Amino acid sequence: MNSAYHRHVAFPSGLGTSTSRQLHSMVPMVLVPVGSTEQHGPHLPLDTDTRIAAAVAGTVVEQFGAPADRDAVVAPPVAYGASGEHEGFPGTVSIGTAALELLLVEYGRSASKWTSRIVFVNGHGGNVEALAAAVALLRYEGRDAGWVPCSVPDADAHAGHTETSVLLHISPDDVLTDELVCGNTAPLAELMPRMRSGGVAAVSELGILGDPTTATAAEGERIFAEMVNGCADRIKRWQPDRNGLLT
């Protein structure tokens, strides 16, 4: 056995920048951001959901600090999800629910060999079905897994006030403010019948469901803090439902 391999090495918060040696004597909880690569109107980047999930996960770990009983680390994000409703727009890459579910299951099975807990931090609503099925299976197999949504009450649906405000807070240089226009602001329940058959393009030519013209960085800071606090509280309580959603 190489004794040098067991030297204590400071543990960074990012899995992607860690080394195997740094992980060797630890059994951390790993937070895995799960996002998407999909259109977000003419003003937001394709990786908006991934950025939000990664930023929330990273801030949650910073809030946790370094508790004596558990280290926490943020994994590189899963940047592709179930985004079929956005495939009418260039740039969208959807792997679908079945592929995402399989990816998450195999991810959890592998990571559980060296982690204490796995938390998927979800930034895209289209991923929920895959997350629920995958985490339920992981838990059935005896793995300590859960998932949390980056959600807030009264949020609009897509690329509107909510997401644009958050991006103005976490990635202001990547919001094309001169492209801000109001999208379809009808209730989502009213739009769903047409979206099921024709996707988002059937109800919004620009791919916006909501009104980004009202977005502000200050509002984004408030919404982001609410997302972070909500996820952190769920993780601290650790009360998964039958689908692994932390409540």
From Swiss-Prot:
It is an enzyme of class 3 (hydrolase). Signal peptide: none annotated. Keywords: Hydrolase, Iron, Metal-binding, Protease, Zinc. Its EC number is 3.4.14.14. Its cofactor is Fe(2+); Zn(2+). It comes from the Bacteria. GO terms for molecular function: hydrolase activity, acting on carbon-nitrogen (but not peptide) bonds, in linear amides; metal ion binding; peptidase activity. A divalent metal cation 2 binds at H40, D49, E163. MftE appears to bind one Fe(2+) and one Zn(2+) ion per subunit. Fe(2+) seems to be catalytically active while Zn(2+) could play an auxiliary role. Disruption phenotype: Cells lacking this gene present delayed growth in ethanol as the sole growth substrate. Glycosylated mycofactocins are produced in this mutant, albeit in significantly lower amounts than wild type. MtfE can likely be complemented by an unknown peptidase present in the metabolic background of mycobacteria. Peptidase involved in the biosynthesis of the enzyme cofactor mycofactocin (MFT). Catalyzes cleavage of the MftC-modified MftA peptide to liberate its final two residues, which consist of a cross-linked valine-decarboxylated tyrosine dipeptide (named 3-amino-5-[(4-hydroxyphenyl)methyl]-4,4-dimethyl-2-pyrrolidin-2-one or ADHP). Is required for the in vivo ethanol assimilation in M.smegmatis. This is Mycofactocin precursor peptide peptidase. It comes from Mycolicibacterium smegmatis (strain ATCC 700084 / mc(2)155) (Mycobacterium smegmatis). The lineage of its organism: Bacteria, Bacillati, Actinomycetota, Actinomycetes, Mycobacteriales.
